[in-house]
C-alpha cells in the first residue's frame, strides 16, 4: 500500500494536485480512447468539463453521503469492549445480536485494535459472540487479537482481507439439520486473507479462499472455484467440492477429503499436483486443524474424523502447486544443512533462479 500511495502521489504532482479532494470532478483531465467498436457510446455527460469549475461540486464535504458509522454495532457496542480490555489489561468477551444489514461487522473494532496496540497484541484479546445472520464482509480485515464467533450464518465476503484475526461460524445447538449438508456462509469468503484462522461449521459458497495468501481455514464443503488464485496459507476441506478447484493456485497447501477418489475430475491441474496424505508433517497438520475445528465449533463431522483418524486420513488428498512444492523442498533442504528459515529461503530463491540446488 505504501508503494501504491507513493506512485499515486507522483501522478498527482505531475497533474498539479496536492490532495485527492482537489482532483475529484476534474473531468477535463480525462481523455476518451478511440476504440472502433465503441464509437456509439456517448460519454459527453461524464467528460464535459463545463462543470469542472462550478461552485457546486459533488465532492463538497457538506454533500458527502453519511454512512451513519456512529450507529453501527462496532461503534455502539464493540468499541466499549476494547476500552474495557485496555483498562483492565485482561481478555474481554461481549455478546451481540446481528442481522444481515450489519455489513463489515468487526472491521471498525479491528482498526481501533491495530491503532491502539499495533502488533503487540495477544490472541483472543477480545472475543465477540455474535448471534443471527451476519451481513456482507463479516469480519473483514480483522487483526490479531480479535475473535469473532458467529452462531448462525453469514453472507458473502466473510473474512475478506483477514489480517490475523480469528473467525468461527457454527450452527446453533438446537439445529435439526446436518451442518455439513447446508450452506452456512456465502461466496468469496476469505478473499485476499493474509493471516489468521477461520473455522466454518458448514458449507461455503463459491470461490472459497480466493487469493488467500496466508490464512488457515477449515470448512465442511465448498462450491465451485475454491482456492482460486491462492498464493499461501493452509486449507482443510472436510466435504464435497465444486468444479474448477485450485484454478490459478500458485501457493499454499490444501487438504481435501476425497472418499470417492474423484477429486481429479474437479481439479484444475494446470498449476497444481495432488497426492495421498502420508507424510508425518502433513498428517500432523491435518489432525491439528481438525482438532481446532472441533474445539471451536463442536462439529459432528470433525468428531467423526477424529474418532477414526487413521482410517479417514487415508481418504484425504494434498493439493500443492508445482513450483511452490519445489521451493518448499529447497527450503527444507537448506534447513537440513544447518541454515535458519530466513537464510534457507534466500538460498532456495537463489537456487531456484539458477535452476536447482
Predicted region positions:
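Long, distal/terminal scaffolding or interaction modules
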Residues: 1-18, 24-27, 48-357
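Polar, glycine-rich mid-to-C-terminal structural blocks
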Residues: 31-35
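Juxtamembrane/interface motifs at transmembrane-helix termini
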Residues: 43-45
Amino acid at each position: 500500500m505504501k508503494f501504491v500511495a507513493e506512485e499515486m502521489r507522483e501522478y498527482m504532482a505531475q497533474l498539479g494536485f496536492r490532495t485527492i479532494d482537489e482532483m475529484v470532478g476534474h473531468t477535463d483531465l480525462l481523455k476518451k480512447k478511440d476504440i472502433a467498436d465503441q464509437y456509439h457510446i456517448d460519454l459527453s455527460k461524464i467528460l464535459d468539463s463545463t462543470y469542472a469549475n462550478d461552485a457546486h461540486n459533488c465532492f463538497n464535504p457538506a454533500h458527502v453521503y453519511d454512512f451513519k458509522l456512529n450507529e453501527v454495532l462496532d461503534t455502539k457496542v464493540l468499541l466499549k469492549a476494547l476500552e474495557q480490555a485496555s483498562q483492565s489489561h485482561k481478555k474481554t468477551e461481549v455478546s451481540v445480536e446481528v442481522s444481515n444489514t450489519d455489513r463489515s461487522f468487526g472491521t471498525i473494532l479491528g482498526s481501533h485494535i491495530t491503532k491502539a496496540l499495533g502488533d503487540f497484541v495477544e490472541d483472543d484479546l477480545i472475543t465477540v459472540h455474535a448471534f443471527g445472520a451476519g451481513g456482507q464482509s463479516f469480519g473483514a480485515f480483522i487483526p490479531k487479537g480479535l475473535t469473532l464467533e458467529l452462531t448462525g450464518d453469514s453472507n458473502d465476503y466473510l473474512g475478506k482481507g483477514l489480517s490475523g484475526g480469528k473467525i468461527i461460524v457454527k450452527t446453533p445447538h438446537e439445529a435439526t439439520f446436518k451442518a455439513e449438508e447446508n450452506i452456512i456462509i456465502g461466496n468469496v469468503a476469505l478473499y485476499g486473507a493474509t493471516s489468521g484462522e477461520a473455522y466454518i461449521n458448514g458449507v461455503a459458497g463459491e470461490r472459497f479462499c480466493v487469493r488467500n495468501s496466508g490464512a488457515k481455514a477449515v470448512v465442511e464443503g465448498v462450491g465451485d472455484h475454491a482456492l482460486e488464485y491462492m498464493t499461501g496459507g493452509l486449507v482443510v476441506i472436510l466435504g464435497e467440492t465444486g468444479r474448477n478447484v485450485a484454478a490459478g493456485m500458485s501457493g499454499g497447501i490444501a487438504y481435501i477429503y476425497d472418499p470417492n477418489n474423484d477429486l481429479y475430475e474437479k481439479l484444475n491441474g494446470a498449476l497444481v499436483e495432488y497426492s495421498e496424505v502420508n507424510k508425518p508433517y502433513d498428517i500432523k497438520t491435518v489432525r491439528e486443524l481438525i482438532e481446532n475445528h472441533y474445539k471451536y465449533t463442536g462439529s459432528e463431522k470433525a468428531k467423526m474424523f477424529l474418532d477414526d483418524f487413521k482410517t479417514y486420513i487415508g481418504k484425504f488428498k494434498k493439493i500443492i502447486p508445482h513450483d511452490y512444492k519445489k521451493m518448499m523442498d529447497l527450503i527444507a533442504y537448506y534447513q537440513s544443512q544447518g541454515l535458519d528459515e530466513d537464510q534457507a529461503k534466500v538460498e532456495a530463491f537463489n537456487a531456484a533462479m539458477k535452476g536447482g540446488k
